[in-house]
Amino acid sequence: EVSTNEFKKNVELKGISIIGQNDEICPADKHIYSIRDVTATIESYPLICASIISKKKAEGINALVLDIKVGNGAFMKTLEEAKKLGNALTNLSNSLSINTEYIISDMNQPLGFSSGLWCEIEESIMFLKNEKRESRLNQLVFKICSTALGLTGQKNQQKIIENAISSGSAYEIFEKMVKSHKGNLKDSYLK
């Protein structure tokens, strides 16, 4: 687990980090979730929005791409539900000066050629190394990344993304992030 200070330092020095909810980042979120759980309001759109967007606001981000999953492998089962949630999240986030767009992705089948946490991590690493890129996963990665680049004013998004993957820089950045979190890809995966 990464502390809030380590997270900030990693973002400052390396430009990338990940962090989960903790006592410093949206401490009320776990309490809101437990209330949703005992009051049968897990599916409450306003509470879902409050949970997700409060963390994003606390992180201090300026732009956000939300990937709303829909289908039998997702929380949102219908396209209508996914659009309703996407619009609610986007409206709230934009009202807080976070430039936000959402996309909807189909979870009625796996995105890649494998499923299961370890297998999906392995596939993600292979993707970043440009060793194996399954079509559906490739399309979703390009859609999310091009939307994110567009939100920041970047042009030639497809070219930037392809270059990051084919040059190995996407994997190198991922590897730096893993190391900054005290992980070791060489010992853990893909020997």
What are these regions (language model features)?
Residues 1-59:
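Phosphate/pyrophosphate-binding betaalpha-module
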Residues 12-14, 41-44, 48, 55-191:
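Well-ordered secondary-structure scaffolds
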